[in-house]
């Protein structure tokens, strides 16, 4: 699908110079003299290199067509995470560095959305919120409630987040996977 330069947004995947690029930053500029343009900072998905490119407003780029499929998380080893398509029972593996820190939020049978580009898994999208158990946290001291204070907590998956003072070890909480922040207690 063709996109004009003014339609390019952060997070989009575009095909440019025979490579697949993820848009990191975009700024639309209308100088006093000359035509408007979009200054776009992109990162190559395959080569892990960055590129700053200037597109005139009249130029168009090709938006990458991604196929999105729901998968269930199965397990992990030292190198990969393993997922299964619940319809076909097909299993795939994805390198841990592809998912990054959010991989710690994966729990058995968690439904995720995997985007494919030319039948190659590209991104893994977790649900916006997941349920976790607080493994350890400090005891809240009386008198600390004058301001909205948070205390550090370690979850059962090893992730460290900030939680309100009333949260104790063993409590089940909901965590936002986009920001890795506490949402609410269950």
Curated annotation (Swiss-Prot):
UniProt keyword Signal, yes or no: no
Any one GO MF annotation of this record: translation elongation factor activity
Pathway the protein contributes to: Protein biosynthesis; polypeptide chain elongation
A Pfam family that the UniProt record links to this protein: EFP_N
Annotated PROSITE patterns: EFP
Record-linked SUPFAM superfamilies: Nucleic acid-binding proteins (SSF50249), Translation proteins SH3-like domain (SSF50104)
Entry-linked InterPro entries: Elong-fact-P_C, NA-bd_OB-fold, Rib_uL2_dom2, Transl_elong_fac_P/YeiP, Transl_elong_KOW-like, Transl_elong_P/YeiP_cen, Transl_elong_P/YeiP_CS, Transl_elongation_fac_P
Primary subcellular site in the record, as a coarse category: cytoplasm
Subcellular location: Cytoplasm
Keywords in alphabetical order: Cytoplasm, Elongation factor, Protein biosynthesis
GO biological process entries: peptide biosynthetic process
Gene Ontology CC entries for this record: cytoplasm
Keyword Ion transport annotated: no
Record-stated family: Belongs to the elongation factor P family.
Function: Involved in peptide bond synthesis. Stimulates efficient translation and peptide-bond synthesis on native or reconstituted 70S ribosomes in vitro. Probably functions indirectly by altering the affinity of the ribosome for aminoacyl-tRNA, thus increasing their reactivity as acceptors for peptidyl transferase.
Protein name: Elongation factor P
Gene responsible for this protein: efp
């Amino acid at each position: 699908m063709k996109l004009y330069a003014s339609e390019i947004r952060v997070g989009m995947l575009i095909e440019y110079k025979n490579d697949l690029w993820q848009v990191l930053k975009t700024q639309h500029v209308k100088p006093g003299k000359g035509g408007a343009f979009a200054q776009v900072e992109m990162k190559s998905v395959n080569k892990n290199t960055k590129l700053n490119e200037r597109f005139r407003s009249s130029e168009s780029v090709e938006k990458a067509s991604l196929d999105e499929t729901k998968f269930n998380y199965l397990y992990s080893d030292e190198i990969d995470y393993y997922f299964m398509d619940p319809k076909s029972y097909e299993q795939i593996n994805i390198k841990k560095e592809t998912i990054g820190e959010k991989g710690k939020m994966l729990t058995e049978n968690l439904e995720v959305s995997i985007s494919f580009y030319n039948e190659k898994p590209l991104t893994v999208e977790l649900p916006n919120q997941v349920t976790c158990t607080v493994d350890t946290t400090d005891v809240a001291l009386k008198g600390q409630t004058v301001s909205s204070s948070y205390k550090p907590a370690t979850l059962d998956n090893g992730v460290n987040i900030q939680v309100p003072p009333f949260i104790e070890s063993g409590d089940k909480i909901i965590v936002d996977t986009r920001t890795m922040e506490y949402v609410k207690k269950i």
